[in-house]
Amino acid sequence: MIEPFLGTWKLVSSENFENYVRELGVECEPRKVACLIKPSVSISFNGERMDIQAGSACRNTEISFKLGEEFEETTADNRKVKSLITFEGGSMIQIQRWLGKQTTIKRRIVDGRMVVECTMNNVVSTRTYERV
């Protein structure tokens, strides 16, 4: 179930991302920069822990976690969140919670691409990545 996600991915398309990061509460200038960045994402698994590294010219982030166990994360926009990542129906589901708020990041593989659907309240952004 995890294997299709493993590897390095590059962003090839992004829909409604500015509205999503606005809904997260990201201020105007960093929001504009975030929309211009085309990050790469590397996902690995060592049998016990999963690692997700996201990198761009502006910022690199890395999380290391056990599936199904909550962990603390500092996001690319510097939010301090509690995250929980699980697998459901072939999708990797990440829920981030902070200050009474919640966002869901759903990753799935569609036709060899990784499709990432980010939802905050009623705002949805879809970002598509191709394997490098």
UniProtKB/Swiss-Prot annotation:
Testis. The modification Phosphoserine is found at residues 13-14, 40, 42, 44, 91. Pfam families: Lipocalin (PF00061). The keyword Amino-acid biosynthesis does not apply. The keyword Metal-binding does not apply. Keywords: Cytoplasm, Lipid-binding, Phosphoprotein, Transport. Belongs to the calycin superfamily. Fatty-acid binding protein (FABP) family. This is Fatty acid-binding protein 9. It comes from Rattus norvegicus. The gene is Fabp9.
